[in-house]
Amino acid sequence: VLGPKKDHNMYYDFKNFVYSRRLNYVDYDELDEPQLIEKIRALNVDAAVVCSFNYKIPRILLEATKDGFINVHPSMLPKYRGGNPYSRVIMNGETETGVTIHFMDDSFDTGDIIAQKPYHIHSKATMGTIFNELNVVGIELLLQVLRAYEVQPLPRIKQPNGDFISGKGLSEQELFINYNKTAEEIERFVRALNPFI
């Protein structure tokens, strides 16, 4: 298991959780360091699964497994690529989002799609409710994908090229209420930041 870097506030909690499950934890300083690549290659891994990992994974690491890296992304790609689709879908007034499981490539959230599952956004949903519910949807979909992977190669559906709505993280300037917006936009904004931001 690869987790957050040592300077991340969740490092020790995550590492202790991994050890409590009697799994191997691999420490690293940089994702492209030769020691890490060799450790992954030595494990003879078929594929790696990535969830909530906001660092770009270099090609040399992506190629260290037999079939590559698989990412669980909380949106219906190609819409809302990036690190915070949860807030963006609420702020934009979307009524549907979902989870995409896809192969990783050199860019963020642009790899071939394996599977998708839509999710209806309730009218009073917050970032927190969507985050929690999409985690459940993502786990269920990932289990289906991994079971299928045990018996056959996974499908690879190319994502279309083009400009799509971004799911990037919020900038500091975006964390303040703009009172020039409508009441509906402000209400969505508050829900989009509740409870994490």
Protein language model features and the residues they cover:
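One-carbon transfer enzymes
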Residues: V1-P195
